[in-house]
Amino acid sequence: RQRQMCIRDRLRLSKETQGRALFNWHMFQKDMGELKDLLTKSSHIYPGLGDAGAHVSQIMDAGWSTFILSYWYRETGTFTLEQAVEKMTSGPAKVLGLTDRGVLSLGMKADINVFDADQVTELQPTLVHDFPNGAPRFIQKSRGFKATIVNGAVSVRDGELTGTRAGK
């Protein structure tokens, strides 16, 4: 059973953190059974597709791809590892008409994420103020990703940027 935080607890935490506490509010699709039906019975639903950051100061949905691995693959077994990876790679590429991406093949463009499927998990979103004029946005980090390789160069290692910028 998921613990519901009462208003008294929220007010106390808000006071203790001088208003900096963040509270998750799951707005959409709370019924995981219905969501499972949508994800498994339709070949047209790819949760990794987002709004390109249009609402980064209000909502956080960047953890979806990690959630596919941690929840739908590892915890529930809804997808095999191969199916989970397809939901994040070739499936969305096809939907978007990106014919040169989505699979690892000679001549294709590819960023490669190296991860430990037994460790991948999404962390709590955090609010940062790194937009122009100190405007806020939510970011969500993860655990279990070992490296991101772009055009043969490691750009992220163990969650930290390496400074290498090999993208085109």
For each feature predicted by the language model, list its residue ranges.
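Flexible loop/turn segments at secondary-structure boundaries
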Residues: T17-A21, A54-S57, P92-V95, V120-L123, ...
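Short acidic/histidine-rich active-site segments
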Residues: K41-A62, G107
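C-terminal cap of metal-dependent C-N hydrolases
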Residues: D37-I45, V114-E160, T164-A166
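Gly/His-enriched, cation/cofactor- and phosphate-binding structural elements
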Residues: D61, F67-K94
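Short, small-residue-biased leader/transition segments that mark boundaries at the very start
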Residues: Q2-I7
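Mid-to-C-terminal alpha-helical segments outside catalytic/metal-binding sites
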Residues: D9, K87-G91, A110-D111, I149-N151
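Non-catalytic terminal accessory segments
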Residues: R8-K15, G19-K36, T40, H44-G50
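Acidic, glycine-enriched loop/beta-strand segments at the rims
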Residues: L22-G33, E82-V85, A93-L127
